[in-house]
Amino acid sequence: MQPQSDKQSASRLATTTSHSTAAASATAATPPKVKVIKSKRPLCHFKFYLDICDHQLAKRIESDIKALGGHLEFFLSDDITHFVTDKPEVIGGTSGTPGTPSTPGTPTSHYQQNDGSARKPNQRQSRADAILSRVRRSTVGVVNSGNSTPTTSLKRSYTIWQTDYAQRFIKRIQTELKQYLEGKKEGGGGSTSASPHHIQLKKQYVKIESVKRNYRPYYHLIKQPDDWPKIDLSSEDGAFRLLTKSKTKDKEHSMTRKPLGSRTSQKDKQAAGEAKPLQHPSLQELKKQSAIPNSPRSNCREPIDSSEKQGGVCEICKLEYDILNIHLQSKDHELFAKNSDNFLALDTLIQSSADVNRFLEEEPVESELDMDVDESLSNEELQSPRQRPSPALREKSKRITKGKHSSEKFQGVAVASPQTPFPGAKKVQGNSPGSLSELQRQEHPTTAAATPTTNSGRRKTQNSGLSPPKRAMLPPSSIYKVVETREECATPPRGRGRPPNQVDSPSLIVKFQKIRQTELQRLNGEAENFMFPRTAVPTTRSSSELPTDVDRQTTSDVRGRYSISSASLDTSTSEAETKESSGLPTSIRKRAQAVGRRRKVGGAAAQDVFQRQLSTGSSSSNSNQQRFPSAPIQPEEGPQPQPKPQLKIKIKQEQLVATRKSSRTATAIVTAATASSHQQQQLRQTTCRKMANKLEDRMGELVKPKIKIKKEVIEEQKVKELEDLEEILDKELDEEVDSSCSSGSDEDYIAGSQRRITAAPRKSTDTREQRAARRLSRLTINRSAGELELTEVKTSPSKSRTKIQKPSSPTKNKVKQTKAVPPAIDLFFDCSKSERLREMQYTFESLPSGELWNRVFLRQDAGEENYYTYYGSTNYRKLPYEMGPIPMAKTLPAHSCALCREASEVKQDKGEQIKLEDQKPAPKKEVKKEEEVQSSSSSATYKNKKLHLLQRYQQEQEQLQQLEGNSLATAGAKCDSKASTPELLEREFASGSMGDRVQLIERVRSTSSSSCSNSQRSGITCRNKQLARIAELPPRKSPREHASTLALVSCIIRQRQDSQSKTNSEAEEPPPPVAAPKLKTPIKQEPVAPSSPRTTRSQAATPVEELRFATEISETVKRMRRGQNKYDHSPPAPVPTPATSSPVRSRRLTPAARNQSQIYSRRLEFATSQRESSASALLGKRKRRVNPSVAGTVRPTTQNLPGTGAYRGVRKLPSKKGLLEYEMETCALKALDQARQYCNPGFVAWQLDKYLELAGKEYDIEFDQISPEVESEGREERLVNTPQTPPPTDCFTSEFDLCDLIMGSAGSGDDDEDVSRGNPPGSGRRMSNLNLYASYYRKRKSLKSNRTGWPKAQRRRNAGGLGGSRALPDERINFQKMGLAELHPIKQEPMETEEEQTTTTTTTTTTSATRGNLLSKDDEDDEGGGNSPSGGSPADDKQNSREDAVMTPPATDVDEQAEPQADEMESLPDEDETMADSVDQQQDVEAEIEATDADVEEEEEEEDEDEDVFEDAYEEQDMGIQKTEPHEKRARIPSISVTTPPEDSSQGKKLLLTLHNGQRLQATSTPSTGQVQQHQRRTPQLNGSLGSCISPSEKLGDNSDIFTVSSDGLDTDLDLSNTQAGDSHEHCPHQTTPKRKFDISKYAPPNSGKAASSCAAEAATAAVKSLAISQFLKKETCASSSSMRNAWRRTQRRAISAACISAAPSARVPN
């Protein structure tokens, strides 16, 4: 029986069950089925009854049972599960008792029955014994008598165990429990294999785990060191076979599956040998699976002949094959593999990551010797790559795997590992000694370097592999390098071999983490220094590098030029080695370094080596920081970009110096290099030659070999591409450096750009390198032409500045070369350097410079990309990298984007200006910095965002000052600074004519797209946005899809996606007609070549911009969530140039001109409107007032058909959601060009003044007098047009920088909005400026933000497309004017809420007069901007309140709600008008209110269902109002806008009210009107209408603050709103407070007397608003809300209104 019990499953988990089952079968009563539990008390369910005579045994068993959690029963009852007895089982004794069979049934003797024991007594015992046994049974209660035994046995529910079996079972459970507790918890209280999920991974292992932890992690223990997976590039099996023990001869010969087969056998042996030590059955299963054909591991070790039997696709050739070996030997494959051009991408990747060459560069001295040897070896390997790599890799992998734990590494190749004693080692030894030493080298790169082996000519570190112990002792960085050392399996050694040396296979991960942190911290070479500090040779470099790091800008600059010599001295040996290695044929060295790289970069091998050395050198310099040269994902080596700057520096000093020891050195070099671009050019040429010999600088050495390799390879393969990219990258880096220096993070950027610069000179070492260096110097010269002066000047002021400027000068030079000097080699050179350096920089970040799309984006960022876009009806937009070859600078100028041309021109100008800027280098540098900052955003560096912004602002200030003297300089500064403050933006807009702005923008554009968008803000941004809208390029997805970029820009991308989705819906709608169509003389309508990448590109945020956006957006979002904005005031709206002066309008006025125009506008406004509230009259408001007049002027003129685009010639084509496609007619292009054309600021100012005097007054008068029909037409058209053109992207798109967002200038967004609103180019420009600011503020501040803080209003931009008419820039009602009269209405807080929502809902803005002033334009912007910017305006301004509403819908809702309540309560007399007017206005107001509410709700879009019904109902209503009052209102509103003060008169009030009402209703149609109406809404009118609605419908209770959407439904409320109109104006100023916060108190307090009550009511009703407004608006306000929604939605958002209304109130409530 015992044997049987033993036979039972090892885990007694089921033992009882089986026994009980057996018993059940034997016995009628089924024994209990109890299972062992996997826990510390496995027998917790067991209840034992012990019938044991032996006391000791009973005590022992009892203690064991208790220890295992079992229970002991002292009475034999049915509860017991097991009956343990020491009595012999009666097999036959139970004759006649059916229970006996149970014992046999359970062959286990434990089923001995009491009956059996009783029967025995019956048979042989005396009667006393029988009685005793019977008594025992009775005591147990199971057996009453021997005769009853059968029945008891039948009835018994327990299992009978013999004591011996019980002991065995207990012992088994104990052992299992011990294992379970020891970590074999998988085996949890039962079988060893019971819990394979908890395996203790020891030694080397690969673990694949899901981040979400939805799946059980997969792990693979690597018991044998050579089992460690290796990427054997030279194996026939493929690059990523799990190279196991049989990696030697078979692998050497074929590198196919035969070695795999042998590996399999070895692994089988291992499995057999390890079966005993196997920790878990799961491990055994894994081992077995490896032998199983279908198992994942079996794939790695396919049968030896599998390659012959199995067909497949060659991933290299992309060809299918039946037999792998035959295919590998085919000419096609060989030719393909030998063509290094086929592996450029891989080469780039490899070079950007840990690299053998880099490692060699890191250890130049050893590298020299080893490089020579390695080259011979590498040649041999090239001849027989499979043979050598396989043994080397196998041995290396073995040792690496063991290396961690065992001294096998130390012992040598022979000692594979305890587990694999010598199979791997013998194989390795069996292989060429080179392979063994190579493996050792790989394992211990440093040691290898120390002990050069003839076998390992490639890396000294590899050679040191001969003495594994030393290598093993080396720090992980060297190990990393060793892994990379692998020539043919550069990746496998990199990835696998080194980690074991580091003692951690996970060390790779750790390194990566370190790399990431460092890389993120220092995108430039510094990241490399930190990430890949070298301990051996690198120490010297690191020592030099450290000083460079410490003195980055000062010492670094000095070292960059001179101090690098210290680095050069350190590097001199390495450089000498590198040079010697370089001395070896670059191709040979390259081959030696990496077979894969060899293939790809045949001639570039030396360059790769040099690059690696450079990178390694940088790493070495960073030896204090861990470096992982062999890291598979090594950053391309910030040093590579650095080498270029270093070369420049060395140009000053020597290229040895120029070569950066480290990224820090590179930074210094960049500084130095920046100092003298021409010197750098010359030095590059000379230094490039010197570099070959004088890469003594650690960086220099590393950089130089890299440059050689890179340059050769890249020149040969990607010379054009890489150089082009390099130029762009250099440009970006330079810009980054400038901006970085400004920001305090310039060093990082500088480092990057310097690397590129340095790389170029070093490349010159080779003939190609020299050529590239010369070309680069040419580029540098070209760039320097404009930049050199700056660079030199800056250099003299400060080397750090020189750094910054030098990169910028290279940037400019490169840009110029891209444009003027298009030498392919130059481009290649730049690209190769910058590209790989950039790649290294971003390897762990976001910039995959090696990828085509990234190059395209870089080009785009630099404004050098030629967009071959098509404006067809197709919805598909090619990604930038899908658009074909990236045009070179040498491409026909026609193909060169305007930015490129402008950049070349601007560079020339800069050449001249640089001298000026030498005098005032800060502003110029600021401009460059801006450009660079934007470029560097891609670098994700804005470490010092605030510093950067400050600097930008300062730069802007300086440039603004310069702008008066030098419009171009100002423009550059403006572009770069991107109007840090609204005032700056206003200045920019007002200060420069459109032409000036355009030139500025063009210039900036050429410099950097983001910078361009900033400076363009007034002119070019408008055009770009228009063009972007016209031909909305899809956001560049590739870079954003890049993991690092995604991480950096994910928030931006999300926001842009939101805005785009909304924008797309709007995009589907025709772009809102700009004022230009209405203008008889469209100023901007001159055809602007949409080809200008800047124009097209402005929409997509550049990586730099995105980085900046990410930072600023996060800040802005936080602010928005708090209801704050960086600038908690409405963005100053630039004074719109009168529509009459079309050319002027399209240009920014000089500050003086703007001031004059503002004065004029102010006079006009005051003359026309007495209501103007000085409090509300901000500069922006005044500008807006001017704008309204301009808008008014243009509005009648600019009545685009509903379907017309932003410009007359621009038609939106049906497009897919997310894509805006426009057709541009010549007139539109002309208008755009005209807008961009430069105009003398003074002339523009004069024009503005004159226009304001003449046209403005006329319009002021006319607007008051203009028939409502005309205005309604303009409004309607605008309504139609505005919604059609959603802002191309989020308010955070590249169109406007976050700086602009922060500044509240709607930079590019505003321009786009201007265009979309269809303002005439001139007035559109002016108004666009205002709109841009307002919309920007809306976008930035007023954007209704979800709880998440992201603007929900973007939906409104989509849905607001219809409502966007309100945002029509043409009709920008100067809510200053309106707002002056109506800023007070606290009760219009609902309106204010609406204004914030009007940001969301343009009409809503009307609530706040102050905001309304801004919003009059902002609303236009919002609506005109397709409501995309609806939240753009800062919530602070009431003008911006609408705009603000978009960004912060909840706050806006609450604030607006509160405001309407306050306004209602206030019943400001200011806006009291005749009952007829009141009624009309109230209807309009109610419509507007509802529209606003709809806007708010639309933002929320919670009640989209109701929207359609309401919209339809309201649409009719609104249309009537719109057509009747809106014209009047519009006429008044424009006049109000232009001459808000005069219009503030009763007529103005009426107009305002009408505009308010009409705008509210027609806000969609006329943003200006909407704004005015909003102001009037703020006026008690709105409040009254709101209040009336609210009062009658107390369901809303305080929901009236929600501008009782029902107000529209309650037409009777008009009277109330009229009565309350005056107060709202009085309280408008308080409403200037950002609505975004939705702080009712925020708005209520300014509402003076009524502020408290309204605030209290609003606060009290805040919650009610959400509920009541949602419900009441839905119920009672269905009609009114629909009217409201229709009012602003009529065009754009009819579907959303109901939902938005419901949602908006709720949104308000939260705030």
From Swiss-Prot:
It comes from Drosophila melanogaster. Disruption phenotype: Adult lethal. Residues 1-31, 87-129, 244-307, 365-507, 531-647, 733-771, 791-817, 908-945, 1005-1025, 1055-1157, 1271-1290, 1303-1329, 1343-1370, 1383-1644 are annotated as: Disordered. This is Protein chiffon. One of its GO terms (biological process) is photoreceptor cell axon guidance. One of its GO terms (cellular component) is H3 histone acetyltransferase complex. Residues 1400-1695 are annotated as: Sufficient for interaction with Gcn5. Residues 588-601 have a biased composition (Basic residues). Named after the phenotype of mutant embryos that possess a thin fragile eggshell resembling the chiffon fabric. The modification Phosphothreonine is found at residue 1081. May be proteolytically cleaved to produce a N-terminal 50 kDa product. Residues 365-378, 1453-1475, 1483-1518 have a biased composition (Acidic residues). A zinc finger (DBF4-type) spans 307-356. Zn(2+) binds at residues 314, 317, 327, 333. Residues 1-400 are annotated as: Sufficient for interaction with and activation of Cdc7. Transmembrane segments: none annotated. The modification Phosphoserine is found at residues 306-307, 406-407, 417, 432, 435, 467, 542-544, 1091-1092. Residues 549-560, 908-932, 1435-1445 have a biased composition (Basic and acidic residues). Residues 493-505 bind DNA.
